[in-house]
């Protein structure tokens, strides 16, 4: 579950452990851990287009959730994301979300 703390620009990830305790950590920490795991699995192999891979992993769910939150209102979604509507439409098309 992703939450944004009030009065903060830090997105957090909430997790529940086996004792039903909820912990929160910044989204960037989860991304960093995912990248560490990814690099560990590479065993020294070269990687191409890592930026695009990571961006797609974050951008697609971001678009999905923003479009759900705005009930499909592209103008409002673009404003929330700080991009113009044409750019939003292009990104939605890229991920087959149009």
From Swiss-Prot:
Keywords: Activator, DNA-binding, Transcription, Transcription regulation. Residues 74-93 bind DNA. Signal peptide: none annotated. SUPFAM superfamilies: Homeodomain-like (SSF46689). It holds the Pfam family HTH_8. The keyword Transcription applies. One of its GO terms (molecular function) is sequence-specific DNA binding. Activates ribosomal RNA transcription. Plays a direct role in upstream activation of rRNA promoters. Homodimer. Belongs to the transcriptional regulatory Fis family. NCBIfam families: PRK00430.1 (NF001659). PANTHER family: DNA-BINDING PROTEIN FIS. This is DNA-binding protein Fis. The lineage of its organism: Bacteria, Pseudomonadati, Pseudomonadota, Gammaproteobacteria, Enterobacterales.
């Amino acid at each position: 579950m992703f939450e944004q703390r009030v009065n903060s620009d830090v997105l957090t990830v909430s997790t529940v452990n086996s004792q039903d305790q909820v912990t929160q950590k910044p989204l960037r920490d989860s991304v960093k851990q995912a990248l560490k795991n990814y690099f560990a699995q590479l065993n020294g192999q070269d990687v191409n287009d890592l930026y695009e891979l990571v961006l797609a992993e974050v951008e697609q769910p971001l678009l999905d959730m923003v479009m759900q939150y705005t009930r499909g209102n592209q103008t409002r979604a673009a404003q929330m994301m700080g991009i113009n509507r044409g750019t939003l439409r292009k990104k939605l098309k890229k991920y087959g979300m149009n």
